[in-house]
Amino acid sequence: NDLETICANFGGENIAACIVEPIAGSTGTLVPPKGYLQKLRQICDKHGILLIFDEVITGWGRTGSKFGAQEFGVTPDIMTMAKATTNGVVPMGVVACNDFIYDAVMDASPTGAVELFHGYTYSGIPVAVAAALAVQDIFEKDDIFNRAKNLAPYFQKGLFSLQDLDSVDNIRGYGMMGGIDMKLNTKPGKAGYECFKACYEAGVNFKATGDCLIIAPQFICEEKHIDEIIEKLRTGITNYQKNQKN
């Protein structure tokens, strides 16, 4: 409803686009409420606003589907991708758009001119494209997306089993991604950092954003690897709790 309010205050015709992550990743695996993205699509259509999905994190299987757009059944006008596009081997970013935007770019170009000038220093590197194509072949050959989808329920069950730990405030998860909020320590960010260190010493590494632990296992994991991750998370968080009492 915030977008609708902004449209009412400033005019939808003055808003070019709305960009969102299907699931906010680095801010703590924030899963949208049911129907949220569908409502966003409706508002954008109503006011002629382009809907952009940032699928840098959710793209290429992280949600259990190839893209978050497919998982939630919402089609954006523009989609951005990176990271898993090349499996991180070579940095690469990709932008996909619908036919309306594509045709607008192509038709607006003078005859004989480059349709979309994007010849920047780090753009269009052939080795990145080659890496992306090779990775896509592996995704298909090894059925990576279905592996992730099938493993996701087991991972989520293990993730939420940590809810009984005293220092854990909240847990969120979807597909092969999860966020564990730690209870506030003396100042914001301290609990997350101290818990990150304790878990690292226990043998598991992840990203901590503020007081949230971001857990995103590899798709090639097996159940035994998920068990190991959860066990070491429990050990690390428990050790963190003990250190706080000393």
List where the protein language model places each region:
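Conserved N-terminal phosphate-binding loop of PLP-dependent enzymes in the Aspartate aminotransferase
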Residues: 1-246
